[in-house]
């Protein structure tokens, strides 16, 4: 009986560890348009990381991506992970419409059904963006007004 309690307590502690590091890049996973699993640890090392949680159907999200692509040269030094909760057909359509597959620093996919990223950040409104330095330390969370200009300035400082 004591052994079961101890084992349960250990499992709880270990499983909560993933959620207890809000100042680090979350250990997310998503499915890319090519059907492969992409994990946070697959992001290139030594570069700042931008995580964008979005919906292809969201007008504010579409506007954010247009602004991001207009200034993509300023963001080339960062890895950009774009994550949605919607099904893969929506992701593929969004990638095609915005020609996102031509950018080697943009990683896009769906966490369809898990909502891990949404829960991790307690996201209430889209789009959502988080900026991390090259060591994976949180620099800034953008959850109200998202400014690509501010993001660009902060990336230059890193």
Where in this protein do the model-derived segments appear?
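Thiol-/selenol-based redox modules, centered on thioredoxin-like
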Residues: 125, 131-158
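N-terminal "domain-start" segment that seeds a small globular fold
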Residues: 18-41
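Bacterial Sec-dependent N-terminal signal peptides
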Residues: 1-24, 158
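Hydrophobic alpha-helical segments, especially N-terminal targeting/anchoring helices
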Residues: 31-32, 110, 132
């Amino acid at each position: 009986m004591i052994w079961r309690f101890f084992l349960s307590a250990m499992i709880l502690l270990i499983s909560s560890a993933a959620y207890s590091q809000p100042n680090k890049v979350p250990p997310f996973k998503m499915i890319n348009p090519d059907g492969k699993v992409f994990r946070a640890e697959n992001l290139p090392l030594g570069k700042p990381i931008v995580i964008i949680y979005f919906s292809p159907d969201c007008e504010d999200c579409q506007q954010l991506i247009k602004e991001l692509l207009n200034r993509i040269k300023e963001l080339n030094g960062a890895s950009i992970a774009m994550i949605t909760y919607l099904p893969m057909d929506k992701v593929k359509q969004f990638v095609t419409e915005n020609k996102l597959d031509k950018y080697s620093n943009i990683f896009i996919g769906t966490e369809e059904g898990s909502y891990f990223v949404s829960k991790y950040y307690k996201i209430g409104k889209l789009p959502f963006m988080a900026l991390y330095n090259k060591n994976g330390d949180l620099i800034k969370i953008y959850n109200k007004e998202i400014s690509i200009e501010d993001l660009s300035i902060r990336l230059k400082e890193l």
